Each structure stands twice: as structure tokens, then as C-alpha cells.
Amino acid sequence: MKLVFRWYGEKHDTVTLEQIRQIPGVEGVVGALFDIPVGEVWPLEEIMKLKETVEKAGLKLEVIESVNVHEDIKLGLPTRDRYIENYKETIRNLAKAGVKVVCYNFMPVFDWMRTDLHKKLPDGSETMEYDHRLIEGVTPDELIKRVKEGSQGFVLPGWEWDRLEKLRETFELYKNVDEEKLFENLVYFLERVIPVCEECDVKLAIHPDDPPWSIFGLPRIITNKENIERMLKAVDSPYNGITFCMGSLGANPENNIPEMIRYFGKMGRIHFAHVRNLKFTGEKSFYETAHPSFCGSHDLFEVMKAFHDIGYEGYIRPDHGRLIWGEKARPGYGLYDRALGATYILGLWEAIDKMKKRYC
């Protein structure tokens, strides 16, 4: 595996490249251009500036998260072809900079959802929580206000305020889009973009829906083994793959995470992975924990063993961490707990590797 660490850039992150460079085993960062409006082409010049900044710190830039998909593409509007052409050009530019994997998602309106960005845990740390009862009791506008107030001035990925200004209008448009129509729109997008990925040797990796069920009546289509497999078969190319986010898929206890890793891993379709843990608190409700197995509801040893069993050589990053030791940072993306998560992942990998060599 290749261990990487998400970084939001000098303008948007409290974590520095120098700090990331000092985390044992981390080879590169997962980056993006956050000032380019969704749907516009990422200029090669700006991509190269980011690459040079990262490489100057002794790290690699081979994974991008995310090149967001314009809402018109998800809705299947007549304007989608222009945005798809822009997406294809962005992939070509990223390939010229040496990028190997592009993460994206196909979630309508909201890229992810939490109901509390600063849940206090008994040890004094802060984490993010999702309580489905609260979703059922508020309007989208009220929830956006709550998230904006809890962001502490940081721009949260997928919650860029310019994207949410037309919220009511966007919700009206989605009244005509059910899960089947959204899936058709995803296939339309992939059929046009994947050939460019093949041409440029850039793998496209869809991120599962977070959480993996419908919210506010919006359709969700990347939530379990069955619909992921359907998506992969619809455009059957090794360049059409997934970002295996165990936190997103693992929010549904019916998803067998190690089994899914083995299944899709043997197909060669896991191009990128997010590893984190969470604790179930009720039906469709959870909060995010530190990475170790005893902290949450998932067995990280079995998760990492599944990756090792398939001979995974792709990219893995520690996902959301708690805010600990008084750190003030973007919710889920401070330095310390994610660094602890990175070393935990690395330690599990080393232990599994040595056990196999010794006893097999």
C-alpha cells in the first residue's frame, strides 16, 4: 500500500506540508484546487504550482480528491455535456502533472452529512456525529445554517457555500430524479469520461455516499456491494473504480467491510481507500472515533488484513480524526489524530505482513 494524507493547501489548511512530511510512512498528499468553481477546467498551470509545492516538501501528489461533478451532470440537464467536456480536460491536465487517481462522488446536493461537528467525548476530544433523528426533524436550510456555524470559518469539502446558495432551486430539480434516473446519469458521465482516463492512464474512483442512505428524500446510489458492482459492470473498465471509504460504507452495519474489500479488491477496482472507525449509537446514527478497533464498532485489524490479503498496492489515507490536544482545525481534519491513525494503519500492516511471512 501507499500511505497518503489529505491536505487542503496553504490557504485552507492548518496542517503544513512540513508536519505531514514528519509522519512515519506517509509518501504523499491527497490534494485539490479548491478555488476553481465546480464544473470549470482546472488550469494546468495551477495544477503544476500545487505539484511543485508538494514535491518541494519531499512528498508526492498522485491522488486528487476531489474533482467535483457539476450538479447539471447529476441532474441530466441539457447543459451537462459542456461540463463533461470540462471534466475530461481537467483529467488530461492532471495526467500531465503525474496524477494517477481522481476521487469523485455522485451525491446530490450534499457531498456528506453530519448533524454535529463538535461532539464532546468523555476524554475531552471533539468529533463529528450523525443522528438521523435530527435529520428527520429539520429542513435542509436549518441544517446548512447549523453546519456553517460549526465549521469555525473553514470551508468544508462538499459544503462550499456558493454551491448551496441555490439550495431550494436544486431541490426542486431533484423532484424529477429518482435512484434509477440518477444511476442513468452516472453511467452517461462515465461512458464519456472513462475513455479519457484510459487514454491518459488516470484511474477514476467514486466515493460511496455518506451516509449510505437517502436524506431529505434525495436519491443515493453508491451505498452497498450490489449497487457498486452494478456501477462497475455498467462501464466495465479497470479505470472505472472506487474509493473504498470504510467509514461511509461502514455506517451501515449490514455492509461487511472486509468481505467487500476482498470482493472488489480481487476485481482490481479499489484505486483508493479511506480508513477510519465509528461507533454506532442507534439506527442510522453514529459518531466518529479514533482509529483503533477498541475505540469503535469496526475491527481495523480485519479491515487491514483484507487489504493485505488482496495484495493491495494502491493508496490509503487515514480518514477523519478527532480534534485532540487543544487543536483548532477543520472538523475531522486536524493533524494529531490523523497522524495517530496513519501510524496505527502502518503498524497493523507491518504486523500482518510479518505474521504471514513467519507462519505461512
UniProtKB/Swiss-Prot annotation:
Function description: Catalyzes the dehydration of D-mannonate.
Names of the cofactor(s): Fe(2+); Mn(2+)
Taxonomic lineage from the root: Bacteria, Thermotogati, Thermotogota, Thermotogae, Thermotogales
GO biological process: D-glucuronate catabolic process
Organism, as annotated: Thermotoga petrophila (strain ATCC BAA-488 / DSM 13995 / JCM 10881 / RKU-1)
Gene Ontology MF: a single term: manganese ion binding
Protein name (record): Mannonate dehydratase
Assigned protein family: Belongs to the mannonate dehydratase family.
Claim: Lyase is one of the keywords in the record: yes
Leader sequence segment: none
Reactions catalysed, as given in the entry: D-mannonate = 2-dehydro-3-deoxy-D-gluconate + H2O
E.C. code: 4.2.1.8
Origin superkingdom: Bacteria
Cross-referenced Pfam families: UxuA (PF03786)
HAMAP family on file: UxuA
NCBIfam families referenced in this protein's UniProt entry, alphabetically: PRK03906.1 (NF003027), uxuA (TIGR00695)
